[in-house]
C-alpha cells in the first residue's frame, strides 16, 4: 500500500499545547499528563500535527508542506513519513483504517 494514501487521526489521550514559542504533545495516562513522555515539536512537526484530522491523506499534507516550507516533494515525503512513524511508535496517532 502507498503510505501517502493513508489517513490518521489523533489519539484522544494525547494533548497538544503551545507554550510560548514551543509546541508539545503530552500523553494522558490515568487522567494525568505523563510528563516523562513529553514530545517537543518543531515548526514542521507542529504544522503536520495540526493537519492530522482523520480525513486528509498524507499526500495532501505532503503537498501542504511543499507549499508552506518551500521544500521539494521527496524531502517533504521523507520528513512526513519519519514524523508519522515516530507518532505511530508512541501511539500518538492511529491509522483511520484501524478504527473500522
What are these regions (language model features)?
Residues 1-46, 50, 96:
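Acidic, low-complexity/disordered tracts enriched in E/D and polar residues
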Residues 37-100:
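Long, charge-rich, low-complexity alpha-helical segments
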Amino acid at each position: 500500500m502507498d503510505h501517502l494514501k493513508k489517513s490518521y487521526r489523533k489519539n484522544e489521550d494525547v494533548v497538544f499545547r503551545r507554550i510560548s514559542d514551543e509546541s508539545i504533545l503530552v500523553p494522558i495516562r490515568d487522567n494525568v499528563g505523563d510528563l516523562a513522555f513529553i514530545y517537543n515539536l518543531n515548526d514542521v512537526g507542529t504544522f503536520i500535527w495540526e493537519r492530522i484530522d482523520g480525513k486528509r491523506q498524507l499526500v495532501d499534507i505532503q503537498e501542504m508542506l511543499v507549499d508552506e516550507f518551500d521544500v521539494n516533494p521527496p524531502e517533504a515525503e521523507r520528513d512526513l513519513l519519519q514524523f508519522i512513524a515516530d507518532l505511530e511508535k508512541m501511539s500518538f496517532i492511529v491509522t483511520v483504517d484501524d478504527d473500522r
